[in-house]
UniProtKB/Swiss-Prot annotation:
This is Probable Xaa-Pro aminopeptidase pepP. Catalyzes the removal of a penultimate prolyl residue from the N-termini of peptides. One of its GO terms (biological process) is proteolysis. Its cofactor is Mn(2+). It comes from Talaromyces stipitatus (strain ATCC 10500 / CBS 375.48 / QM 6759 / NRRL 1006). Coiled coil: none annotated. The lineage of its organism: Eukaryota, Fungi, Dikarya, Ascomycota, Pezizomycotina. Binds 2 manganese ions per subunit.
Amino acid sequence: MTSTEGILAGKYPAKAHARRVVEYLRQNGFEGDGVLYLEAQKTKMIEDNDSEQPFRQRRFFFYLSGCLLPDAHLTYHISSDKLALFIPPLDPESVIWSGLPLSPTQAKELYDVDEVLYTTDINPTLAHLASEVGTSGFVFAIDGQISDDISFKNFPETDLVALKTAIEECRVVKDAYEVAMIRKANDVTAQAHVAVLKATKSATNERELEAAFIGTCIAHGCREMAYHPIVASGTSSATLHYVNNDEPLIDLTTNKKKLNLLLDAAGEYKTYCADVTRTFPLSGKFSPESRQIYDIVLEMQTKSLAMLKEGVLWEDVHVTAHRVAIKGLLKLGILRGSEEELLEKRISVAFFPHGLGHYLGMDTHDTGGHANYADKDKMFRYLRVRGKLPAGSVITVEPGVYFCRFIIEPYLKDSELSKYIDADVLEKYWEVGGVRIEDNIHITKEGYDNLTTAPKTADQLELMINGS
């Protein structure tokens, strides 16, 4: 049994997470006793339909329970260190359609909780806990995630803000179980990326490759996608979050395959996400221009990865990626001027407009990054993580170079900025579209662990497409 499989054979560490959240509350001024209260996502019906909407568990609830059941509740009593899960009781009317639900005994075996009760017991339990916490005790819950029939009236104090913040901040640093979940999602995602590479030669439409990806993920245990797959062929790859996924892989004007396909797609394993991007030649061989850009982006990532360890300032890593892009585009003649002047004028933002990466966990764009979307410096405006990276965090490293007319043409029309871009040389690169390479990185005290195993070098990608 592998290390990942061995870790995942155990229970999700819900109680450890509850204790971590309480410690955060204590560090931020909370004293005394109290109760944490959270609700699972409710069963919801499709509007004008008798079918249920696809279910996605609330991440705050899962973090303190490890439970994927809808319509559940939990309480954590701080002073007694007791975590209780409340699950829906058996509904005889639904058994003939859906089978028997999980029993309290079964739930107790599955989840890292001290007690499992039915949801009909939640208000009596809250009333009892209110009597236990004393005259200055708190109940912590999340505004907007409290059912109308839930009563906190017996608690001296109610806080609907602090718990959400505490969980968001605690989620940044992952424990071994969480890292194993992300690694598992990455392992399945890598198999799906390989399946797409192998299907490329015979496919005629983006949707065929999307189907190959999703089918492989489901077959290997990731029934949900971490996000809507991006399967962008040709110049559509210059659109950062292209989602149509239904264009032909043939350029109808030349009757030849488009140059490249950008595949940004990943599976989700029991709420934990991967987030992986690869860009590869649809013909099985990079064009000279595509290979030049691919090599620049790969170097952007390689130089960024070399900087990673506990305490590194993420803004510094982001700037390093821009410096590599500038140097590479200067060498190709696309940019003109000095490296420092191009950096100062933020010219590289025209080709690399997004941030270098984001935290990853139960959400693809995970919590705790403290982005500043109002930043007046356009190089940092879309940087989703600001500040130093702690050991235990998981972050994406996803540099890219894009030839997007919507973004670049305003630079070409600007009398001041246009002098830094050679439009004649640029003309050769529009068909490249966009190149992005994205891996998922676990930060350690001395360095990092790359959780992503999908083929990445240009030679590997070409060999895989060509059946080697």
